[in-house]
């Protein structure tokens, strides 16, 4: 199948290494995950090879799929304050959250010499967030 962008959003390990290579060979230049870990390890290796060779974009679920969790948190906040936000208000808040995630992930990747590598950037940004929280609470 030919596509420019693939959005695997169904199940874990939905795309294996051979399928990832086929996507790339057929012109796909971006995979943005909408499910929890829809690409297996071999697929991720294929994405990384394509990123290095041709600038392929791969946004892992841990960053790209954060929108569902964010909207759930917004809903809980809205409910606890007995508020009722419009679609536009929720969408605006979500866009801000997702832009912030992208900024943190891309900044972390660049800061540590992995510009364009959103897997490494997401891992580093996530680690920094947890480490900062532990330091702030005096756990380290």
Question: Where would I find each of the regions flagged by the language model?
Answer:
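Rossmann-like NAD(P)-binding element
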Residues: 1-17
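Adenosine-phosphate binding glycine-rich loop
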Residues: 9, 24-140
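Histidine/acidic residue-rich metal-binding segments in metalloenzymes
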Residues: 21
């Amino acid at each position: 199948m030919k596509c420019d962008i693939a959005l695997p959003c169904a199940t874990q390990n939905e795309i294996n290494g051979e399928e990832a290579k086929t996507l790339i060979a057929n012109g796909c230049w971006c995979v943005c995950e909408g499910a929890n870990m829809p690409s297996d390890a071999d697929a991720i290796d294929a994405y990384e090879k394509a990123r290095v060779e041709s600038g392929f974009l791969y946004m892992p679920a841990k960053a790209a799929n954060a929108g569902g969790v964010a909207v759930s948190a917004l809903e809980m906040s809205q409910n606890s304050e007995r508020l009722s936000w419009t679609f536009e208000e929720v969408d605006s808040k979500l866009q801000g959250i997702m832009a912030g995630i992208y900024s943190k992930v891309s900044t972390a990747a660049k800061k540590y010499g992995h510009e364009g590598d959103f897997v490494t950037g997401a891992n580093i940004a996530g680690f920094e967030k947890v480490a900062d929280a532990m330091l702030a609470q005096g756990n380290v």
